[in-house]
Amino acid sequence: MKVYILSILLFFSISSFSQTKSVRELALELSIRDLKMSELVNITNDKFSDSIDKAKFIYYWIGFNIKYDYKLLEPKSTLREKQNAYSYNFYPGQIFVKKMAVCYGYSKLYEWFMNKLGIESTIISGFIRDERNHYVELDSDSEFSHAWNAIKLNGKWRLVDSTWGTSLNEGVADFYFDMPPERAIISHYPKNSTWQLLKKPLSLKEFNNSKFINPIWFKIGYSDIPQMKMDSNYYYFVFKNNPNEDWLVNLMYSVDNKDFYNLREVKTIIQDEYTILRFYKSIIPKKTFFKVNLYKSIDNIDYSLIHSDVINFKM
């Protein structure tokens, strides 16, 4: 009887949530409650009828409640010790109680909830690149191995990374739910190319030659992936204008990917809805690394560096 009464109280408590709250806000409000896994499944089904909302709700709940287990990154004295420390990541129930995981554990827990909610899901294994590691080398980049999910909604596979969705920055967290394949491949390289979900999957070489772009580029208003074009005399770095005109793009180059320098004699051309940075090919070495920094106007007078290493690529 006590269990029945508690279930009724929990139902009415959850039902009292404002109908105007977003899925994210509901997940945040619910994160302070001590729930069983089955209760969270029931609440999700009671609160949402749309599968996309269910998948997003669990994504946010995991982001708010499961912390990354950085201790597992510390060196272990033996392989057995490392395996024992890592083993809980294979068991969703242990992850749920422990409230900690590494990437495989995040994807395993997310997969468990999707299965309980009747949403087809799979775990994708592969590699990631970020600000620390712009280029993936399969033989030496084991520390950048990663796991994420694909879920099938309305007959379409969608990419979800609940590990990277733990960011408290709403814009960054949103980026990793239902990632468009052409944006997911910026940072996520699956071992099975099928899970790139691209019409023409990239080889590892093509992946490493493509641009690494921090999601902040899209969050602050840029909408496309910049392109480097050329003719006999010039390079042209081309991107769509940002509706927020306070931002300024700074393109730098390096021969060793360590020391970067500002380009000389850059001409900025505004053409229709695009910005073009034009510079002489003759000043660029044959093998060159580029990076983009973002400056923002302060009081419409001076520009301050706000985000560095936002885009990295090589030629």
Predicted regions, residues:
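A generic secondary-structure signal for well-formed alpha-helical elements
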Residues: 12, 62, 66, 70, ...
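Hydrophobic/aromatic-rich core segments of domains that either
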Residues: 108-184
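Alpha-helical and coiled-coil interaction segments, frequently adjacent to or embedded
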Residues: 168-315
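Gly/Ser-rich catalytic serine loop of serine hydrolases
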Residues: 103-107
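Bacterial Sec-dependent N-terminal signal peptides
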Residues: 1-21
